[in-house]
UniProtKB/Swiss-Prot annotation:
Protein name in the entry: Succinate--CoA ligase [ADP-forming] subunit beta
Pathway terms, separated by semicolons: Carbohydrate metabolism; tricarboxylic acid cycle; succinate from succinyl-CoA (ligase route): step 1/1
Binding site for Mg(2+): N191, D205
Transmembrane segments: none
Reactions that this protein is recorded to catalyse: succinate + ATP + CoA = succinyl-CoA + ADP + phosphate; GTP + succinate + CoA = succinyl-CoA + GDP + phosphate
Length: 379
């Protein structure tokens, strides 16, 4: 279960980790009041459970309380990567000298707990691992022994911190381990952790993920279980679809988890970016196809819809009728690329071609076409 940034920072603060002064606002007026208490320049951060919110306009600045109210009104009126903004964290603007990356996580592939340390703060961990492996330090933690002070010394040296800040690093890393242990967290991340202009270490951003299986031990969070679903994921769950939201622009609808994952891999292979995982299941009815297609057609991020169906117990003619009805009911005119193969394929193909859709028999051809359309629409 993902915690909101303000919740993660509250835990960090209670464990002695320095965080910026701030407060939560549910309205623009509350944002102004919080900004007045802080005084001076502030940063307003949309509390959403998606990544890269800064790039999506979810982090804005204000020079005074009146401007903070205006900026908050703007934030509350928008969606950040598909999520409606209902809470804003208003914080003092920190004068940053240097940014770092610091996390404590469970490396499941190697079955170990590790600190990940990098001088490249603000960079996603996936990008660090892939592009800058020499800028990433791994410090293994034996769960029997736990955190030891030498770990913070290794981290401080790697980051090039002045020696007067080594005690701060020790306190932060020790607290991170205690948070993981006490909250059953599988991720405690500060990105960035910064050295301020006044030579202090502060966690400017914080992320904590709690193991779902331990929620019975954390009543304060258990009540909110499931809230990490995006709006689209919540709708899909109510409709009974297997759906996961991603960051791409090619909507994907298939029957069967294996075919869906294979289609996503093909999209990535040909240079596209999947917007989602959506498995309509075997034997899907016209109504089920219609609701799934409507979900993706109405998704703001989806530029083109790719449908890949292998008809066994799923009948291609039912799929075709569902797609046609979805377009008619939503009135959304987005490119749709369709691959049909199997039961009642000829009927389904005829229905779709009568409506002007091109239907492919080979998945490769359909995927290439969808990627081409998405790229052209991005130019």
């Amino acid at each position: 279960m993902k915690l909101y940034e303000f919740e993660a920072k509250e835990i960090a603060k209670n464990n002695g980790i320095p965080v910026p002064r701030g407060g939560i606002a549910k309205t623009p007026e509350e944002a102004r009041i919080v900004a007045e208490k802080i005084g001076g320049e502030v940063v307003l951060k949309a509390q959403v459970l998606v990544g890269r919110r800064g790039l999506a306009g979810g982090v804005l600045f204000a020079s005074n309380s009146l401007e903070a109210e205006k900026v908050a009104r703007e934030l509350f009126s928008k969606r950040v990567r598909g999520e409606k903004v209902e809470l804003i964290l208003v914080e003092e603007k920190i004068c940053i000298d240097k940014e770092y990356y610091l996390s404590l996580t469970i490396d499941r592939s190697n079955r170990e707990i590790v600190y990940l340390v990098s001088p490249l703060g603000g960079v996603e961990i996936e990008e660090l691992v892939k592009k800058y492996p020499d800028k990433l330090l791994r410090i293994r933690v034996d769960p029997v022994i736990g955190y030891k002070p030498y770990m913070s010394r290794l981290a401080a040296k790697f980051l090039g911190l002045p020696k007067e800040l080594w005690p701060s690093m020790h306190k932060i890393m020790n607290s991170m381990y205690n948070i993981m242990k006490n909250y059953d967290a599988d991720l405690v991340e500060f990105n960035p952790l910064v050295k301020t202009c006044s030579n202090e270490i502060v966690a400017v951003d914080a992320k904590i993920t709690i193991d779902d299986n331990s929620l019975y031990r954390h009543i304060e969070f258990a009540e909110k279980y499931g809230r990490e679903l995006s709006e689209m994921e919540a709708i899909a769950k109510k409709l009974g679809f297997s759906y996961v939201e991603l960051d791409g622009d090619i909507g994907i609808m298939c029957n069967g988890a294996g075919l869906t994952m294979a289609t996503m891999d093909m999209v990535a292979y040909y240079g596209g970016r999947p917007a989602n995982f959506l498995d309509i299941g075997g034997g899907a009815s016209r109504e089920r196809v219609r609701e799934a297609a409507k979900l993706l057609l109405k998704h703001d991020k989806v530029k083109v819809l790719l449908v890949n169906i292998f008809g066994g117990i799923t009948r291609c003619n039912e799929v075709a009728r569902g797609i046609i009805e979805a377009v008619e009911e939503t009135g959304v005119k987005k490119p749709i690329v369709i691959r049909l193969l199997g039961t009642n394929e000829e009927i389904g193909r005829r229905l779709l071609e009568e409506k002007g859709y091109s239907v492919f028999s080979e998945a490769d051809d359909a995927v290439k076409k969808a990627v081409e359309i998405a790229k052209n629409l991005s130019r």
